[in-house]
Amino acid sequence: MAHKKGQGSSRNGRDSPGQHRGIKVYGSEKVVAGNILVRQVGTLVHPGANVGMGKDFTLFALVDGTVKYSRARGDRRIVSILPEA
């Protein structure tokens, strides 16, 4: 076994792609049922009215309407959908 690294050897050179998390739809934007609103790990943003949550904490719209972000009970962030009339 060599005690010196060979020429051109590198221990770097690997990286993983990003996981595309974050807010996908911002406040007062229009959405249709099924649109993904937030991709997250854990409940950084909690679901409000007309918003569902997947098993990976993804928040999605249950109805067509307008997105509304608000705060409740201290610093808890909530996203809701105001349905179109």
Swiss-Prot record:
One of its GO terms (biological process) is translation. The lineage of its organism: Bacteria, Pseudomonadati, Myxococcota, Myxococcia, Myxococcales. One of its GO terms (molecular function) is structural constituent of ribosome. The keyword Ribosomal protein applies. Belongs to the bacterial ribosomal protein bL27 family. Keywords: Ribonucleoprotein, Ribosomal protein. It comes from the Bacteria. GO terms for cellular component: cytosolic large ribosomal subunit. The gene is rpmA. Residues 1-22 are annotated as: Disordered. The keyword Disulfide bond does not apply. This is Large ribosomal subunit protein bL27. InterPro entries: Ribosomal_bL27 (IPR001684).
